[in-house]
């Protein structure tokens, strides 16, 4: 019975507590809660009695809410708030009037288009027993000077950004101060005045904002190009060297002016003394041909016509003048060659027997000549120039793809041959003609240097091998890629035929050149290599052949040069070989 009585008492107390709480909730006036920063929440844990309340649907925590009112600045015009209005705010009533824009926020900076272009709007007046003092747009709004609306906590603006860049509303790029980087890029720079407003102590700080070097360092200014680094100064122009120091005993035309030409030169028709040729006045000449210097330079192919006065223009050799229309006409060349013919004194045609035998063609393969072409008397080989020329025949590698190695003894043999040839009347007359045409100077050394350069300068015919020269090609022979080339001298042909290495196959054409020589066009094979067409002088001296080829190469390179020997007209064909800035003799032979 005691237990039942206690249970009944406990049940009654529980029901009484439950009804009391329900009645309290029904009578409570609900209002909009304040912001979190204006609400202070105190939580109290329930006692053991709260467990029974929770069991019957009641919460066991008691929440006490107190509003922290911001400090209110009173003014003489402020209206005194009644205790009733301060303790219990009236219920929130939403007006049915149309909503009005509140305008920009009070802390909107001047860089924002919303804060700079229009005046702030006044918010609608709520029914309240208090009246706040309006703030002027020119002064920063301070929420602590306005009383809060009923049921709302006071407005607290956002804290300013920690750096000096304006991040509000994207007000567009601001003009950057001088030296802070490129204009129109990056974030806009805020003004140098920053205002910090807090809810409790109000502090206004004004000062220069330090430049943030860590975030956006200023770009360096453009560097002007340095003349020393980018555009090095050019060296001072060198003064042209003066005239070379004259060498005793060897006067040179480069050191003395040439005689003034008086009239065009025509080669004399009467032979002069072989020891002392009669000098001819220096003729006038044009610039249709580039003369070949004697020291290391070269000439290009001449393109004037094969007739009389060609019309091309090229550079004239330094130190010479040009006043005519042609360096040399065809008639002048023929007159010169006739003069050379009269000076030919070492012809060996009388000591040679020519056995032409049967005719052939270049396309034939049959042997139309079972016997040798030439039968040479030993007296024909006793001429001083022929003796020195024969010493050069064994100095060459005939394969053009094998490098030539000139020994000192071979170089001496070349010089001895040149000295012997340059001393002959034929070669001296040819050099005198070239001197009159401005191709060479009066200095005899330049004549020799010209002949040596044209005929004995080594060059390459392919694969980078220095294995050819003009003399080797014309007066001996060469083999290029299995083809025989050259072989245009009768002395070497006679030696090879005597040794059984030259097999004569027949002739195609022949022509006598007066009584001092012959020209034959033949077909032959040499050590198993066939040459279908080959033209060669027979019986002429080395100096005459060398003089004809040199003059024609200087005046009519890369085409047929008109020649007349003993009133027999034919042509001389020369080909130039360009190598390392020089025009050298690639080939030369008579053409009938």
Swiss-Prot record:
GO cellular component: endoplasmic reticulum; endoplasmic reticulum lumen; extracellular region
Keyword annotations: Endonuclease, Endoplasmic reticulum, Hydrolase, Lyase, Manganese, Metal-binding, Nuclease, RNA-binding, Secreted, Signal
A GO BP entry: negative regulation of lipid catabolic process
Catalyzed reactions: a ribonucleotidyl-ribonucleotide-RNA + H2O = a 3'-end 3'-phospho-ribonucleotide-RNA + a 5'-end dephospho-ribonucleoside-RNA + H(+)
Domain of life: Eukaryota
Ranges of Polar residues composition bias in the record: 109-120
Region feature Disordered, mapped onto this chain: 83-329
Major subcellular site: endoplasmic reticulum
MF (Gene Ontology): metal ion binding; ribonuclease T2 activity; RNA binding; RNA endonuclease activity
Signal peptide interval: 1-24
EC number(s) stated in the UniProt entry for this protein: 3.1.-.-, 4.6.1.-
Cell location: Endoplasmic reticulum lumen; Secreted
Expression tissues: Predominantly expressed in head. Expressed in fat body cells.
Bias (Low complexity): 134-144, 188-209, 268-294
Record's subunit section: Monomer.
Free-text comment on this protein's domains from its UniProt entry: The signal peptide is not required for the protein's role in lipid droplet maturation. The EndoU domain is essential for the protein's role in lipid droplet maturation.
Family, as annotated: Belongs to the ENDOU family.
This protein's name: Endoribonuclease Arlr
């Amino acid at each position: 019975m005691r237990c039942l009585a206690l249970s009944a008492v406990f049940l009654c107390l529980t029901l009484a507590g439950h009804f009391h709480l329900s009645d309290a909730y029904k009578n409570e006036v609900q209002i909009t809660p304040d912001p979190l920063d204006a609400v202070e929440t105190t939580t109290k844990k329930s006692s053991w009695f709260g467990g029974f309340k929770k069991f019957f649907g009641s919460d066991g925590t008691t929440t006490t809410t107190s509003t922290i009112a911001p400090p209110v600045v009173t003014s003489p015009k402020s209206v005194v708030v009644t205790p009733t209005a301060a303790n219990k705010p009236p219920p929130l009533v939403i007006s049915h009037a149309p909503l009005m824009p509140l305008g920009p926020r009070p802390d909107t900076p001047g860089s924002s288009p919303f804060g700079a272009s229009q005046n702030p709007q006044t918010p609608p007046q709520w029914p309240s027993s208090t009246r706040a003092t309006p703030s002027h747009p020119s002064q920063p709004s301070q929420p602590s000077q306005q009383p809060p609306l009923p049921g709302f906590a006071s407005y607290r603006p956002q804290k300013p950004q920690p750096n000096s860049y304006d991040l509000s509303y994207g007000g567009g790029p601001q003009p950057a101060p001088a030296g802070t980087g490129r204009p129109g890029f990056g974030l806009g720079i805020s003004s140098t005045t920053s205002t910090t407003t807090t809810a409790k102590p109000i502090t206004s700080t004004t000062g220069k904002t330090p430049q943030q070097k860590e975030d956006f360092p200023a770009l360096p200014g453009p560097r002007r190009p340095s003349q020393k680094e980018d555009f090095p100064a050019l060296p001072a122009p060198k003064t042209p060297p003066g005239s070379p120091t004259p060498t005793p005993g060897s006067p040179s035309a480069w050191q003395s002016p040439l005689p003034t030409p008086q009239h065009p030169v025509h080669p004399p028709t009467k032979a002069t003394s072989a020891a002392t040729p009669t000098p001819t006045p220096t003729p006038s000449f044009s610039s249709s041909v580039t003369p070949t210097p004697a020291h290391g330079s070269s000439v290009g192919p001449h393109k004037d016509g094969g007739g009389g006065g060609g019309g091309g223009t090229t550079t004239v050799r330094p130190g010479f003048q040009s006043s005519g229309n042609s360096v040399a006409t065809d008639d002048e060349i023929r007159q010169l060659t006739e003069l050379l013919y009269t000076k030919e004194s070492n012809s060996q045609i009388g000591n040679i027997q020519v056995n032409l035998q049967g005719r052939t063609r270049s396309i034939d393969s049959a042997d139309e000549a079972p016997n040798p072409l030439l039968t040479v008397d030993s007296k024909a080989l006793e001429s001083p120039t022929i003796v020195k020329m024969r010493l050069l025949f064994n100095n060459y590698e005939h394969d053009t793809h094998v490098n030539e190695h000139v020994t000192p003894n071979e170089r001496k043999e070349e010089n001895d041959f040149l000295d012997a040839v340059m001393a002959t009347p034929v070669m001296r007359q040819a050099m005198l003609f070239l001197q009159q045409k401005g191709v060479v100077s009066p200095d005899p050394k330049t004549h020799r240097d010209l002949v040596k350069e044209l005929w004995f300068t080594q060059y390459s015919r392919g694969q980078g091998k220095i294995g050819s020269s003009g003399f080797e090609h014309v007066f001996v022979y060469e083999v290029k890629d299995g083809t025989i080339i050259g072989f245009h001298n009768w002395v070497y042909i006679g030696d090879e035929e005597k040794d059984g290495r030259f097999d004569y196959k027949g002739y195609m054409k022949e022509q006598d050149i007066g009584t001092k020589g012959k020209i034959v066009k033949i077909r032959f094979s040499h050590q198993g290599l066939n040459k279908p067409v080959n033209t060669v002088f027979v019986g002429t001296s080395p100096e005459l052949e060398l003089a004809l080829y040199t003059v024609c190469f200087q005046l009519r390179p890369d085409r047929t040069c008109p020649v007349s020997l003993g009133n027999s007209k034919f042509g001389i064909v020369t080909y130039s070989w360009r190598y390392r800035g020089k025009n050298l003799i690639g080939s030369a032979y008579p053409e009938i």
